[in-house]
Amino acid sequence: MTSATSPIILKWDPKSLEIRTLTVERLLEPLVTQVTTLVNTSNKGPSGKKKGRSKKAHVLAASVEQATQNFLEKGDQIAKESQDLKEELVAAVEDVRKQGETMRIASSEFADDPCSSVKRGTMVRAARALLSAVTRLLILADMADVMRLLSHLKIVEEALEAVKNATNEQDLANRFKEFGKEMVKLNYVAARRQQELKDPHCRDEMAAARGALKKNATMLYTASQAFLRHPDVAATRANRDYVFKQVQEAIAGISNAAQATSPTDENKGHTGIGELAAALNEFDNKIILDPMTFSEARFRPSLEERLESIISGAALMADSSCTRDDRRKRIVAECKRAVRQALQDLLSEYMNNTGRKEKGDPLNIAIDKMTKKTRDLRRQLRKAVMDHISDSFLETNVPLLVLIEAAKSGNEKEVKEYAQVFREHANKLVEVANLACSISNNEEGVKLVRMAATQIDSLCPQVINAALTLAARPQSKVAQDNMDVFKDQWEKQVRVLTEAVDDITSVDDFLSVSENHILEDVNKCVIALQEGDVDTLDRTAGAIRGRAARVIHIINAEMENYETGVYTEKVLEATKLLSETVMPRFAEQVEVAIEALSANVPQPFEENEFIDASRLVYDGVRDIRKAVLMIRTPEELEDDSDFEQEDYDVRSRTSVQTEDDQLIAGQSARAIMAQLPQEEKAKIAEQVEIFHQEKSKLDAEVAKWDDSGNDIIVLAKQMCMIMMEMTDFTRGKGPLKNTSDVINAAKKIAEAGSRMDKLARAVADQCPDSACKQDLLAYLQRIALYCHQLNICSKVKAEVQNLGGELIVSGLDSATSLIQAAKNLMNAVVLTVKASYVASTKYQKVYGTAAVNSPVVSWKMKAPEKKPLVKREKPEEYQTRVRRGSQKKHISPVQALSEFKAMDSF
């Protein structure tokens, strides 16, 4: 770093012809094009045409001469105006003039005799010399611009030194005002230079340095003022020196970026993808070998060493404090058994295929298995990291607020105790951020996270110093202002780090972990409620609120990346329900519970109300996750399939239970159903096809009606959709993962069936036709029966048997029973819809619409697609319709309904 009195040093070799700005490149490009075109005029070999003068070559030579003249005029002007590098610029202009004259003569002679190789060679050498001279002139002009920027930097450095040497607060105010003016000028010049820089890395460095300068300038005044007001408090000097150092480093950053010099070693450490991610990527590449050249002695030690290095990194992550026990077990199992065994199997297959030209099927299968196991390990590691992120980036401002409150009270001992907590919190943020980087392939995102983490690491001690200053002088407004500035800076930096970490992690992983953590916290709340532990209840409920708020914030931000449509509407509807309905109810129940438990004489309250409110929070987050996953591909859903509900040890008789007892090897019930034998899958597919035929009947029926004002149609559609999800589950597809999901779906169908029963019975009660009424009631009995059957069959699960050490999966009977029950229910719903309509028509026909109460539901045909007002029709069709109308034949409602054809667009 140059001092305020040192001369300006340009870290740039004047003899270098490296182009560093877009402007030089743009100015040079036309001349390069013209010279290249001229040189290549006769580059196609000897011509059979008569030798003579080339008109094209003369035109090109004239254009080169004119372009050179333009450069000379601009060069003369720059040399006259420039205060820096004046001698070098004048010399460069003369060199361009000299080389331009040489080029003019050589190009003219070449144009007169374009077939002469000697003259062409002379012109090529002259062209190269001219381009070098012009390039050097432009680069010197560019260097002159950099010198002007460095002059501004020197002025700012001097103003900064003046601020540092201020002797009183008034002197500080005056000097800081001057510093601010010079800062504005510097920012303008630096911004222009940033736009001109050719290297994206240098542009990023310039932007970062400008941002750091602006950010620290805010703290510069309050830190200096606090030092002048309380020089006896050591923490004030530490604050001031830190800010001055940050400003000086920002100025140095602008200088380096402007000259496009190499980044510092510190910045080099920020580049590149995560270490563990890079190791896994390299391992995946190294396992693809040529059997012809495979040598066990050469490749086995190398691959085993690489894998052990990966396993060591995974073990460190597994042993970290925030990693859940079950996650740790999964990672260890994945490393010790699955991945190592897959590598040994792969090496064995390579040995069997040694010397062959083509890879055999067993070898390809072994490669796929190895790749799948490393992919599974990646997922487990991402999930472990997300455990840390979910816990550490929750209520990030609490340690800071506690520290500030202690400082305001003037209790220095307490401040030192809370400072240790704050320091541990900051260290945890940095540690978790680095963990997130270690498994990320997002190079740019990793760089941002590491830079933000570095800022957090350096800012943490200064926040503590500001708190110590306030604790020593709690009545001082200057100390309070200084604390506020550092507080604001800390909160901004934490937000930057949080957003950067969110950018390199998966939303799907975040939602999966958040769902499991909220379930864990809900169960803790229930246990605390039963044990009367108010502190644990309050703290855990706060964690639930924080997790839910994070989910809402992240998903709302994620939806901004999508075009507005049905998908985003569904997701935002789920987040809105959680934020505006579910969370207020949960907060209310927590308050009621805490008040009741905190009373001198514990007051009775409805425990089930609290449990229901807690369950709704979990369901709300789960619904958001389901909505987000709606557009995922089957492969992406498969990647998420092994992240099921956690098997927590903490349980109580009233805690929220959502786990499945049939999970094996960390797989979901849906994933197990997908592993059924092909014969059973084929039979299930036949049953599903029959179900789809029944579904098409219901689709045709409900498509006829406008569902506004007709809840029977709405309920029929809902039941149809849920039944489709249940049948998809039997094929190992769809949004339902576990038996608990299928059971919940069956409950929803039963609820919808009960509501349909209530509505249809109201229709039947108003129907005067006893036959229609009896038919409708009979169909309703079928719905009740089939809903009950579906509830029983919803406990579908694949049976897993261990025969000879091999897992045999079967589940045909339970799957076909579920599909059959769904088909029967679908048929009953179709008949109920038809019978409800018929009963409604009988009712209106006998009593008339004016003499009765409003109908239970409104049966209106869906409006047809818009068509031309005048339609050309064949005469015979027109006559036929008139004759049919004139017969006045009575048509029963059922017949009319069956003849009605819904259009595809309905």
UniProtKB/Swiss-Prot annotation:
Keywords on record: Cell adhesion, Cell junction, Cell membrane, Cell projection, Cytoplasm, Cytoskeleton, Developmental protein, Differentiation, Membrane, Nucleus
Single GO cellular component term: plasma membrane
Region (Disordered), start-end ranges: 866-892
Pfam families hit by this protein: Vinculin (PF01044)
Entry annotated with the keyword Membrane: yes
Start-end of Basic residues biased regions: 881-891
Subcellular location: Cell membrane; Cytoplasm; Cytoplasm, Cytoskeleton; Cell junction, Adherens junction
Subunit structure: Interacts with CDH1 and CDH2.
Protein name: Catenin alpha-2
Organism in which the protein naturally occurs: Gallus gallus (Chicken)
Gene name of the encoded protein: CTNNA2
